[in-house]
Protein backbone atom coordinates (compact mmCIF):
# COMPACT_ATOMS: atom_id res chain seq x y z
CA UNK A 1 0.00 0.00 0.00
CA UNK A 2 1.41 3.44 -0.85
CA UNK A 3 1.68 5.96 1.96
CA UNK A 4 -1.48 8.09 2.18
CA UNK A 5 -1.00 11.66 0.96
CA UNK A 6 -3.04 12.72 3.99
CA UNK A 7 -4.18 10.81 7.03
CA UNK A 8 -6.19 12.01 10.01
CA UNK A 9 -6.66 9.80 13.05
CA UNK A 10 -9.19 10.70 15.75
CA UNK A 11 -8.78 14.42 15.14
CA UNK A 12 -10.74 16.67 17.49
CA UNK A 13 -11.02 20.45 17.58
CA UNK A 14 -12.88 22.45 20.16
CA UNK A 15 -13.30 26.20 20.49
CA UNK A 16 -14.24 28.04 23.65
CA UNK A 17 -17.06 30.46 23.08
CA UNK A 18 -17.49 32.36 26.33
CA UNK A 19 -18.39 29.75 28.93
CA UNK A 20 -19.38 27.22 26.30
CA UNK A 21 -17.11 24.79 24.52
CA UNK A 22 -17.92 24.13 20.90
CA UNK A 23 -16.78 20.67 19.80
CA UNK A 24 -16.47 21.11 16.04
CA UNK A 25 -14.44 17.99 15.25
CA UNK A 26 -15.08 15.05 17.55
CA UNK A 27 -12.86 12.27 16.19
CA UNK A 28 -12.38 12.73 12.46
CA UNK A 29 -10.63 9.91 10.56
CA UNK A 30 -9.73 10.34 6.92
CA UNK A 31 -7.18 9.04 4.43
CA UNK A 32 -6.58 10.55 1.00
CA UNK A 33 -4.43 8.38 -1.24
CA UNK A 34 -1.85 9.69 -3.70
CA UNK A 35 -3.60 10.90 -6.85
CA UNK A 36 -7.04 10.70 -5.27
CA UNK A 37 -9.44 13.65 -5.44
CA UNK A 38 -11.85 13.72 -2.50
CA UNK A 39 -14.85 16.01 -2.06
CA UNK A 40 -15.55 17.26 1.46
CA UNK A 41 -19.19 18.20 1.97
CA UNK A 42 -21.40 19.00 4.92
CA UNK A 43 -23.78 21.72 6.04
CA UNK A 44 -22.62 25.22 6.81
CA UNK A 45 -20.84 25.26 10.17
CA UNK A 46 -20.08 21.52 10.05
CA UNK A 47 -16.36 22.23 10.32
CA UNK A 48 -15.09 21.85 6.74
CA UNK A 49 -12.87 24.94 6.90
CA UNK A 50 -11.61 23.94 10.33
CA UNK A 51 -10.70 20.48 9.02
CA UNK A 52 -8.92 21.94 5.97
CA UNK A 53 -6.97 24.38 8.16
CA UNK A 54 -5.82 21.46 10.30
CA UNK A 55 -4.89 19.38 7.23
CA UNK A 56 -2.98 22.40 5.90
CA UNK A 57 -1.01 22.75 9.16
CA UNK A 58 -2.45 26.22 9.59
CA UNK A 59 -4.19 25.19 12.81
CA UNK A 60 -3.47 22.46 15.34
CA UNK A 61 -6.03 19.89 16.41
CA UNK A 62 -7.08 19.75 20.06
CA UNK A 63 -6.16 16.04 19.92
CA UNK A 64 -5.50 13.36 17.34
CA UNK A 65 -2.92 12.86 14.65
CA UNK A 66 -2.31 14.47 11.26
CA UNK A 67 0.08 12.81 8.82
CA UNK A 68 1.16 14.42 5.59
CA UNK A 69 2.83 11.96 3.21
CA UNK A 70 3.50 9.66 6.18
CA UNK A 71 5.07 12.41 8.30
CA UNK A 72 3.45 12.76 11.71
CA UNK A 73 2.93 16.48 12.28
CA UNK A 74 2.01 16.68 15.98
CA UNK A 75 5.50 17.16 17.40
CA UNK A 76 7.02 19.19 14.59
CA UNK A 77 8.55 22.60 15.28
CA UNK A 78 6.96 25.65 13.63
CA UNK A 79 9.89 25.78 11.17
CA UNK A 80 9.36 22.17 10.12
CA UNK A 81 5.61 22.77 9.74
CA UNK A 82 6.34 25.77 7.53
CA UNK A 83 8.70 23.73 5.35
CA UNK A 84 6.22 20.86 5.08
CA UNK A 85 3.51 23.33 4.06
CA UNK A 86 5.81 24.86 1.46
CA UNK A 87 7.04 21.58 0.00
CA UNK A 88 3.98 19.31 0.21
CA UNK A 89 0.86 21.43 0.22
CA UNK A 90 -0.99 23.79 -2.09
CA UNK A 91 -3.97 25.90 -1.03
CA UNK A 92 -6.86 27.43 -2.93
CA UNK A 93 -9.42 29.57 -1.14
CA UNK A 94 -12.77 31.02 -2.13
CA UNK A 95 -11.08 34.40 -2.65
CA UNK A 96 -7.97 34.41 -4.77
CA UNK A 97 -5.72 36.62 -2.58
CA UNK A 98 -3.42 37.41 -5.50
CA UNK A 99 -0.82 40.15 -5.15
CA UNK A 100 -2.51 43.10 -6.92
CA UNK A 101 0.67 44.85 -8.08
CA UNK A 102 2.14 41.74 -9.70
CA UNK A 103 1.29 40.18 -13.05
CA UNK A 104 -0.39 36.77 -13.28
CA UNK A 105 2.98 35.16 -14.08
CA UNK A 106 4.77 36.96 -11.22
CA UNK A 107 2.12 35.79 -8.78
CA UNK A 108 3.12 32.24 -9.69
CA UNK A 109 6.85 33.00 -9.70
CA UNK A 110 6.92 34.53 -6.18
CA UNK A 111 6.17 31.34 -4.17
CA UNK A 112 8.72 29.42 -6.24
CA UNK A 113 11.45 31.97 -5.56
CA UNK A 114 10.57 31.87 -1.84
CA UNK A 115 11.15 28.10 -2.11
CA UNK A 116 14.61 28.75 -3.57
CA UNK A 117 13.86 28.11 -7.25
CA UNK A 118 15.72 30.33 -9.72
CA UNK A 119 13.81 32.99 -11.64
CA UNK A 120 14.21 31.34 -15.04
CA UNK A 121 12.79 27.91 -14.14
CA UNK A 122 10.13 29.64 -12.03
CA UNK A 123 9.02 31.68 -15.04
CA UNK A 124 8.98 28.52 -17.18
CA UNK A 125 6.79 26.74 -14.61
CA UNK A 126 4.45 29.76 -14.46
CA UNK A 127 4.15 29.77 -18.26
CA UNK A 128 3.49 26.01 -18.30
CA UNK A 129 0.71 26.25 -15.70
CA UNK A 130 -0.89 29.32 -17.27
CA UNK A 131 -0.90 27.55 -20.65
CA UNK A 132 -2.63 24.54 -19.12
CA UNK A 133 -5.23 26.91 -17.68
CA UNK A 134 -5.72 28.63 -21.06
CA UNK A 135 -4.26 31.88 -19.76
CA UNK A 136 -1.08 32.28 -21.82
CA UNK A 137 -2.41 35.48 -23.34
CA UNK A 138 -3.04 36.92 -19.89
CA UNK A 139 0.27 36.21 -18.22
CA UNK A 140 1.36 39.85 -18.11
CA UNK A 141 -1.99 41.12 -16.82
CA UNK A 142 -2.41 42.18 -13.23
CA UNK A 143 -5.25 40.63 -11.22
CA UNK A 144 -7.34 43.80 -11.56
CA UNK A 145 -7.24 43.37 -15.34
CA UNK A 146 -8.60 39.80 -15.14
CA UNK A 147 -12.13 38.45 -14.71
CA UNK A 148 -13.08 36.68 -11.46
CA UNK A 149 -12.77 33.28 -13.13
CA UNK A 150 -9.37 34.17 -14.58
CA UNK A 151 -8.16 35.41 -11.20
CA UNK A 152 -9.18 32.13 -9.61
CA UNK A 153 -7.41 30.18 -12.36
CA UNK A 154 -4.22 32.10 -11.58
CA UNK A 155 -4.70 31.31 -7.87
CA UNK A 156 -4.97 27.62 -8.77
CA UNK A 157 -1.74 27.84 -10.81
CA UNK A 158 -0.05 29.55 -7.85
CA UNK A 159 -1.15 26.74 -5.52
CA UNK A 160 0.44 24.18 -7.84
CA UNK A 161 3.59 26.19 -8.57
CA UNK A 162 5.86 24.29 -6.18
CA UNK A 163 4.60 20.87 -7.28
CA UNK A 164 2.79 20.02 -4.02
CA UNK A 165 1.73 16.45 -3.33
CA UNK A 166 -1.61 17.47 -1.86
CA UNK A 167 -3.96 20.29 -2.82
CA UNK A 168 -6.39 21.64 -0.22
CA UNK A 169 -9.20 23.79 -1.54
CA UNK A 170 -11.97 25.51 0.43
CA UNK A 171 -14.94 26.34 -1.81
CA UNK A 172 -12.56 27.20 -4.67
CA UNK A 173 -15.34 28.32 -7.00
CA UNK A 174 -17.82 29.52 -4.37
CA UNK A 175 -17.28 33.13 -5.32
CA UNK A 176 -18.05 32.70 -9.04
CA UNK A 177 -21.27 32.69 -11.04
CA UNK A 178 -22.52 29.15 -11.86
CA UNK A 179 -21.21 29.00 -15.46
CA UNK A 180 -17.80 30.37 -14.58
CA UNK A 181 -17.65 28.15 -11.49
CA UNK A 182 -18.35 25.12 -13.67
CA UNK A 183 -15.56 25.96 -16.13
CA UNK A 184 -12.99 26.89 -13.48
CA UNK A 185 -13.80 23.77 -11.50
CA UNK A 186 -13.31 21.52 -14.52
CA UNK A 187 -10.01 23.27 -15.24
CA UNK A 188 -8.96 22.69 -11.63
CA UNK A 189 -9.82 18.98 -11.82
CA UNK A 190 -8.02 18.57 -15.15
CA UNK A 191 -4.90 20.25 -13.82
CA UNK A 192 -4.88 18.27 -10.56
CA UNK A 193 -5.39 15.00 -12.47
CA UNK A 194 -2.77 15.96 -15.05
CA UNK A 195 -0.22 16.67 -12.33
CA UNK A 196 -1.18 13.47 -10.52
CA UNK A 197 -1.63 15.00 -7.11
CA UNK A 198 -4.05 14.24 -4.32
CA UNK A 199 -6.71 16.78 -3.38
CA UNK A 200 -9.26 17.44 -0.67
CA UNK A 201 -11.82 19.95 -1.89
CA UNK A 202 -14.66 21.39 0.20
CA UNK A 203 -17.75 22.33 -1.76
CA UNK A 204 -21.43 23.04 -1.22
CA UNK A 205 -22.18 22.13 -4.80
CA UNK A 206 -23.34 18.48 -5.16
CA UNK A 207 -22.80 18.48 -8.95
CA UNK A 208 -19.17 19.44 -8.50
CA UNK A 209 -18.72 16.98 -5.62
CA UNK A 210 -19.91 14.11 -7.83
CA UNK A 211 -17.13 14.77 -10.33
CA UNK A 212 -14.47 13.85 -7.80
CA UNK A 213 -13.27 10.32 -7.07
CA UNK A 214 -15.00 10.05 -3.70
CA UNK A 215 -17.25 12.12 -1.46
CA UNK A 216 -16.94 12.32 2.32
CA UNK A 217 -19.31 14.20 4.62
CA UNK A 218 -18.66 15.90 7.93
CA UNK A 219 -21.41 14.84 10.29
CA UNK A 220 -21.40 15.60 14.01
CA UNK A 221 -17.70 16.26 13.87
CA UNK A 222 -16.77 12.99 12.17
CA UNK A 223 -15.95 12.12 8.58
CA UNK A 224 -18.38 9.64 7.08
CA UNK A 225 -18.67 8.24 3.55
CA UNK A 226 -21.34 10.03 1.54
N1 LIG B 1 -11.45 30.37 15.65
C1 LIG B 1 -12.68 30.02 16.02
N2 LIG B 1 -13.17 30.34 17.24
C2 LIG B 1 -14.40 29.96 17.63
N3 LIG B 1 -15.26 29.26 16.85
C3 LIG B 1 -14.83 28.92 15.62
C4 LIG B 1 -13.53 29.27 15.14
N4 LIG B 1 -13.39 28.79 13.88
C5 LIG B 1 -14.54 28.16 13.57
N5 LIG B 1 -15.40 28.24 14.62
C6 LIG B 1 -16.74 27.65 14.66
O1 LIG B 1 -16.64 26.30 14.26
C7 LIG B 1 -17.78 25.93 13.51
C8 LIG B 1 -17.35 25.33 12.18
O2 LIG B 1 -16.84 26.38 11.36
P1 LIG B 1 -16.24 26.10 9.91
O3 LIG B 1 -15.95 27.43 9.29
O4 LIG B 1 -15.11 25.14 10.01
O5 LIG B 1 -17.48 25.39 9.19
P2 LIG B 1 -17.73 25.14 7.64
O6 LIG B 1 -18.30 23.76 7.51
O7 LIG B 1 -16.50 25.42 6.85
O8 LIG B 1 -18.84 26.22 7.31
P3 LIG B 1 -19.17 26.97 5.90
O9 LIG B 1 -19.66 25.90 4.97
O10 LIG B 1 -20.25 27.93 6.28
O11 LIG B 1 -17.90 27.64 5.44
C9 LIG B 1 -18.65 27.16 13.37
O12 LIG B 1 -19.68 27.10 14.35
C10 LIG B 1 -17.70 28.29 13.67
O13 LIG B 1 -18.38 29.39 14.25
From Swiss-Prot:
Subcellular location: Cell inner membrane
GO annotation terms (biological process): lipoprotein localization to outer membrane; protein localization to outer membrane
UniProt-listed Enzyme Commission number(s): 7.6.2.-
Domain ABC transporter: 6-226
Database matches in SUPFAM superfamilies: P-loop containing nucleoside triphosphate hydrolases (SSF52540)
Subunit structure comment from the entry: The complex is composed of two ATP-binding proteins (LolD) and two transmembrane proteins (LolC and LolE).
Annotated family: Belongs to the ABC transporter superfamily. Lipoprotein translocase (TC 3.A.1.125) family.
Gene Ontology terms, MF aspect: ATP binding; ATP hydrolysis activity; transmembrane transporter activity
Topological relation to the membrane, as annotated: Peripheral membrane protein
Protein name: Lipoprotein-releasing system ATP-binding protein LolD 1
CDD domains named in the record: ABC_MJ0796_LolCDE_FtsE
Gene3D superfamilies: P-loop containing nucleotide triphosphate hydrolases (3.40.50.300)
Pfam families: ABC_tran (PF00005)
